[in-house]
Every structure is written in structure tokens, then in C-alpha cells.
């Protein structure tokens, strides 16, 4: 039994990128750099108990941006009883507000740490490499 991207061709996958975006589509091909092409692709955003999809069609994803990918069980793709589908505009606004809230919380944590005498000289990000 072999493992790798070859086993995922023609299957419906979810792909999570380094920036947190999530794409769902049918993988049609890949190359030696793990670049992949998805067909019938949607971008999905989750905020709280809500989600929204944006149709993108045929979509190319660079392999170095992929954090994780996996096959989607069609029967359990979205547990719609637990998640509420809302419009793309509503979800992007909610996601922006959530991002601002997280940034404010991080600033507060840093301020409290600094006032307590704890400092972090440098915070490394994967994009720094």
C-alpha cells in the first residue's frame, strides 16, 4: 500500500493553508512540489457556529502554502444541524471582527507580560524562514 498525494487524486479534499484559509474541491492533479489543482473549488470560512462558501471553480494551490489536506466524507461534510450557513458578506464581516478581537487580546496579553517584567524579544513566524 502506498501513501501520498497520488492516493488523493479524484477525491474531494479540504486544504488548509498557512494563512488559515480553507478550500474544498476535487483534486485533479499534483506535481513534485506538492502544488495541487482543485476542481469545483469553494473557499469556506467558519466563524463561531456559522459558515459560508464562495465558489471559485478550478483552483491552483502552491504546495509550500499547504498546512494540511485530507479527504472529506461526503456524508459528514458539514453538520448543517450544528452550523448555520450565512452570506459571504456577513461571514467576512464577522471574520474581520473576530480577527480584530484576537489582535486586541494579544496586545493586552503582551502589555500585561511587559508590566510583569516578562518580555519576548522576538516572536518568530513561519513566514520569517
UniProtKB/Swiss-Prot annotation:
GO terms for cellular component: Lsm1-7-Pat1 complex; P-body; ribonucleoprotein complex. GO terms for biological process: deadenylation-dependent decapping of nuclear-transcribed mRNA; mRNA catabolic process; mRNA processing; RNA splicing. Gene3D superfamilies: 2.30.30.100. Belongs to the snRNP Sm proteins family. This is Probable U6 snRNA-associated Sm-like protein LSm1. The keyword Cytoplasm applies. GO terms for molecular function: mRNA binding; RNA binding; RNA cap binding. Its main location: cytoplasm.
